Amino acid sequence: MTPEHLPTEQYEAQLAEKVVRLQSMMAPFSDLVPEVFRSPVSHYRMRAEFRIWHDGDDLYHIIFDQQTKSRIRVDSFPAASELINQLMTAMIAGVRNNPILRHKLFQIDYLTTLSNQAVVSLLYHKKLDDEWRQQAEALRDALRAQNLNVHLIGRATKTKIALDQDYIDERLPIAGKEMIYRQVENSFTQPNAAMNIQMLEWALDVTKGSKGDLLELYCGNGNFSLALARNFDRVLATEIAKPSVAAAQYNIAANHIDNVQIIRMAAEEFTQAMNGVREFNRLQGIDLKSYQCETIFVDPPRSGLDSETEKMVQAYPRILYISCNPETLCKNLETLSQTHKVERLALFDQFPYTHHMECGVLLTAK
């Protein structure tokens, strides 16, 4: 695979290999055949980051080869959304001959939605001034004249200039209902929107007929919490990053959801609060004891759950675990399988043509 060529003819074979590999890894814990969710074979990534290489009068996007560290010129990127590809061409054309916009520009980040909105961030090794803002506004207007629904942001050390706004609103059809998700620049969002829809619908399916409330640790912009709210009496979710909490609160209002409560705190602090070890001012007005959380949802980083969180989740009758690293999932299952058994197993092909696998398991108490 090269950045400008995807081996689409090999899609089925690479997916089949992942299914076999996941089944083998999960064999000590389950004999289930994974439910398999396919990605689009191209234009599946909704975000991408590129370094910018200056070559005389020319400049262009590059990425670095992971093995050799050599730079690779990238003029098109079929893994990314069609909108990102349009913007890559338009941004280079708009910046190449503009001394103020191109000087000390070292990176461009793209974030797009299925609803065809985009935020483009230009990263600089220099101070950004009013002259930069004027030129950036002219570029933004020129891009919009090409029917590109784009917002521009300039970034430098300790500086962020958002010309209009630093977010876009995604609209996803989830099990017959359109969900609105505000996505903030430089915050985590699911990279493969088509796969995100399938993950959310799978999570809805496995939690059908749930009793009681749902607890989610590290909910981000509320991606899972809000979609799953229809299956539970109430949802209690924690998140530590302020921009994500603000986006989640917006998403709750935009989707007219009245049974989700977001708390800004770390999982460890939440555990202390739940167990009555410590009191927190930010929990005033929230009666934790009134929640009957029968299900806990976790979507940890690549490192998986730490041992304290492992112990915490074992206290819940049902654990819904989305993993971006099956190796650490299996490590966690060595502990979790002592008290819980795997009821459902899914493979989500979030990153086609790479070694990476995303998977989901539903665990129920033995």
UniProtKB/Swiss-Prot annotation:
The protein's job, in short, is: Dual-specificity methyltransferase that catalyzes the formation of 5-methyluridine at position 54 (m5U54) in all tRNAs, and that of position 341 (m5U341) in tmRNA (transfer-mRNA).
Q: What protein am I looking at?
A: tRNA/tmRNA (uracil-C(5))-methyltransferase
Q: Which reaction does it catalyse?
A: uridine(54) in tRNA + S-adenosyl-L-methionine = 5-methyluridine(54) in tRNA + S-adenosyl-L-homocysteine + H(+); uridine(341) in tmRNA + S-adenosyl-L-methionine = 5-methyluridine(341) in tmRNA + S-adenosyl-L-homocysteine + H(+)
Active-site residues (renumbered): C324 (nucleophile), E358 (proton acceptor)
From the UniProt record, give one GO term of the biological process aspect: tRNA methylation
Similarity field: Belongs to the class I-like SAM-binding methyltransferase superfamily. RNA M5U methyltransferase family. TrmA subfamily.
* Record-listed S-adenosyl-L-methionine binding positions: Q190, Y218, N223, E239, D299
Extract the Pfam families matched here.
tRNA_U5-meth_tr
Please verify whether the record's keywords include S-adenosyl-L-methionine: yes
Give Gene Ontology CC terms: cytosol
Gene Ontology molecular-function annotations: rRNA binding; tRNA (uracil(54)-C5)-methyltransferase activity, S-adenosyl methionine-dependent; tRNA binding
Q: What is its EC number?
A: 2.1.1.-, 2.1.1.35
Task: Spell out the InterPro entries in the cross-references.
Answer: MeTrfase_TrmA_AS, MeTrfase_TrmA_CS, SAM-dependent_MTases_sf, TrmA_MeTrfase, U5_MeTrfase_fam
Q: What superkingdom heads the lineage? A: Bacteria
Entry-linked PROSITE patterns: SAM_MT_RNA_M5U, TRMA_1, TRMA_2
Q: Which UniProt keywords apply?
A: Methyltransferase, S-adenosyl-L-methionine, Transferase, tRNA processing
